[in-house]
Curated annotation (Swiss-Prot):
<dbReference type="Pfam" id="PF02464">
    <property type="entry name" value="CinA"/>
</dbReference>
<dbReference type="InterPro" id="IPR008135">
    <property type="entry name" value="Competence-induced_CinA"/>
</dbReference>
<protein>
    <recommendedName>
        <fullName>CinA-like protein</fullName>
    </recommendedName>
</protein>
<dbReference type="InterPro" id="IPR041424">
    <property type="entry name" value="CinA_KH"/>
</dbReference>
<dbReference type="InterPro" id="IPR036425">
    <property type="entry name" value="MoaB/Mog-like_dom_sf"/>
</dbReference>
<dbReference type="InterPro" id="IPR036653">
    <property type="entry name" value="CinA-like_C"/>
</dbReference>
<dbReference type="InterPro" id="IPR050101">
    <property type="entry name" value="CinA"/>
</dbReference>
<comment type="similarity">
    <text>Belongs to the CinA family.</text>
</comment>
<dbReference type="InterPro" id="IPR008136">
    <property type="entry name" value="CinA_C"/>
</dbReference>
<dbReference type="Pfam" id="PF00994">
    <property type="entry name" value="MoCF_biosynth"/>
</dbReference>
<dbReference type="Pfam" id="PF18146">
    <property type="entry name" value="CinA_KH"/>
</dbReference>
<dbReference type="InterPro" id="IPR001453">
    <property type="entry name" value="MoaB/Mog_dom"/>
</dbReference>
Length: 427
């Protein structure tokens, strides 16, 4: 079964709102075994909405549209559906009664006349009740395709999809169309390095066509999605398990988790299991490492606290760095990172100390180019240091540095080498 997703709203085209609905629908449809072949975004214009929806119905079996079902004058999905199908809009008395009852239940004596727009539907369209809001969805057949028009509010869209759309699509798909996915999460390696390590496996899977691999990179992390389609969930899971085992061998200790795991939660769990604590001394990252370590509930059990030693004076006064060291080596230096980490560890009585220093830009510092980053982790057994050279703007460099710091702490907790060990492609 082929599907397309159409997001409606000028605010999406202008970038005022991120199109999270499309991402959620893509995943939800894939889990139902529905192949999403195209996605589109169209502004608030009846003719253009009708044109985009019409083109989608000629290609796909199912079209899921979001947005444009509210009460205001720029909510035009109902009108566009009517124009596309060549039918009139009709006022649905049951929808109107439900809208009035909902407002009365909220203690609203005055029912805004504009809200009656939400009671209109194209002739032949079936309303989809909205238990999470006011605007109902619509189900409408156009040609050989079915259009599901859903509200743009994410919570309302998801509720209607789960209650009304997903069951119908699952029934239409029938057996033999289960699609499962598993995501392996790597850190500290480039997307190209991950792809190179998996090149032989990827080439083999490309010949088979099922399962498949896909790569998604962001901020120093690369996700590897393994997807398999089979007659039932057990068969699909078995296919994924085989590929996952081989992928983990190839990717080695660069894999830190799977599916919804986050590096913050993984580090928190490792600290908890070890009965260990951590403290942070940050320059380059300005408190972002501490923020990441407190992201997980129960962080106070493992995180002692931190210092943002952003200036030379702060490094000397709050962390006890020797002015002579800074004068000799500058603040962007691996030895400075080690002293910062050990100082905060000692001062706060933590098992581990983590420190960051570097150049986020826009200009060079201490003769070091933008993107130079040093991260240190100290403990009873001595220091571990990574020096990396990152690219991107100031914000991106800082976010990548946070991931490197968290990964270096993870590696220290697991007694792993400071840098990932990947298996390279066979020559």
């Amino acid at each position: 079964m082929k599907a397309e997703v159409v997001a409606i709203g000028t605010e999406l085209l202008l970038g005022d709102i991120v199109n999270g609905n499309a991402a959620w629908l893509g995943q939800a449809l894939a889990e139902l075994g529905v192949d999403v072949e195209q996605m589109a975004v169209v502004g608030d214009n009846v003719a253009r909405i009708a044109e985009v929806l019409g083109a989608a119905t000629r290609r796909a079996d199912v079209v899921v549209a979001t947005g444009g079902l509210g009460p205001t004058q720029d909510d035009l999905t109902r009108e566009a559906l009517a124009e596309l199908a060549g039918v009139p809009l009709e006022r649905d008395p049951e929808i109107e009664a439900a809208l009035r009852a909902r407002y009365a239940a909220l203690g609203r004596a005055d029912f805004p006349p504009m809200n009656l727009r939400m009671a209109d539907r194209p002739h032949g369209a079936v309303p989809l009740p909205n238990p999470a809001g006011t605007a109902p969805g619509l189900r409408m057949t156009v040609g050989n395709a079915v259009i599901f028009a859903l509200p743009g509010v994410p919570g309302e869209m998801r509720e209607i999809f789960r209650r009304w759309v997903a069951p119908e699509l699952a029934e239409r798909a029938g057996p033999g169309t289960v699609l499962l996915s598993r995501v392996l999460r790597t850190i500290g390696v480039w997307e190209s390095e991950v792809a190179d390590a998996l090149a032989d496996l990827d080439a083999e899977l490309a010949l088979r066509g099922n399962p498949t691999l896909a790569y998604l990179a962001s901020e120093g992390q690369t996700r590897v999605r393994i997807s398999a389609k089979a007659a039932n969930r057990d068969l699909a899971a078995a296919m994924i398990a085989e590929v996952e085992e081989r992928a983990r061998i190839a990717l080695g200790d660069a894999v830190y988790g799977a599916d919804s795991d986050t590096i913050e939660a993984v580090v928190h769990r490792l600290l908890t299991d070890a009965g260990a604590t951590v403290a942070t001394a940050e320059s380059l990252t300005g408190g972002l490492v501490g923020a990441a370590l407190t992201e997980t509930p129960g962080a106070s059990d493992v995180y002692r606290g931190g210092v943002i030693g952003y200036t030379v004076a702060a490094k000397v006064e709050l962390l006890g760095l020797a002015p002579e060291l800074i004068a000799a080596r500058g603040v962007v230096d691996p030895e400075v990172a080690v002293v910062m980490a050990e100082s905060i560890r000692s001062r706060l009585g933590a098992t581990y100390g983590v420190a960051t220093t570097g150049v986020a830009g826009p200009a060079r510092q201490d003769g070091k180019p933008v993107g130079t980053v040093y991260v240190a982790v100290t403990a009873e057994g001595g220091p571990t240091v990574r020096d990396v050279h990152l690219s991107g703007d100031r914000q991106r460099i800082r976010r990548q540095a946070v991931n490197i710091a968290l990964d270096l702490l993870r590696r220290r907790l697991l007694n792993l080498p400071p840098e990932p060990q990947l298996r390279r492609r066979r020559s």
